[in-house]
Amino acid sequence: MKQKSFDFFGNVVIVNFPYGEKQSEKKKFAEKLMKSNKSIKTVLEKTGKFSGRLRKMKTRFVAGEKTKEVLYRENGCVFRFNIDKTYFSPRLSNERKEIASKIKKGDNVFVMFAGVAPFSIVIAKNSKAKKVYSNEINREANKYAKLNIGLNNLRNKVELVPGDIKRVTEKLKKQKKKFDVIVMPRPQLKETFLKQAFMLAKKGTRIYYYDFSEEDEIEKVVERIKKEAKKSRKKIKILKIKKAGEIGPYRLRVRVDFLIL
């Protein structure tokens, strides 16, 4: 039997159908899925991978209500966003919860590549952080981030700092902003953006850096971090290396936690 993979987004489910499956079979499967789970109102088919720096995904309507607007809940938070216009991964739910559990009372937190603000909001809602600053380049994602901050009653705790991370970093540097925690759920890009993180770090800053690697090449991710730290004249201590999920055959999302000394 051909395998299907799913991503559940509350009222919407995205199915990755096997190549060549007939449309009638897809519709039949989608209707069966909605019947077995009443919370699912819409079934979409994934037609392309996340692409570009804005990490947009392509989907096609299969059955149910004709919408790509999602209402999704996790970790005591609620999120609204458009599947095709913004990036969101429900598979990172446990990662978000784990990072929130590492935040100390009074921490100032900076989240890069924040999307519709899931990391920022989960951290703000589930920790005693003083303030969470949320950066994203995608304008559409920032609109939803603003909406989500309001939906979760966090206007006093989460601040949007939208725009290109390089320009935002320069602006924050001029304001002499330094952070206790920097979270970097990076897209699959060649550039690490660690230079920008180091510019906003101080002695004692904890950085949670995400990268992608073949299963047998995780050490290369660590070496890249050490190399970037040396370039920025920062001494670091690696605290933890974690396999944070598979994104393909033998290819992993990796999280490296490290401390600025």
Question: Residue ranges of each PLM-predicted region?
Answer:
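SAM-dependent transferase fold signal centered on methyltransferase-like domains
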Residues: 1-261
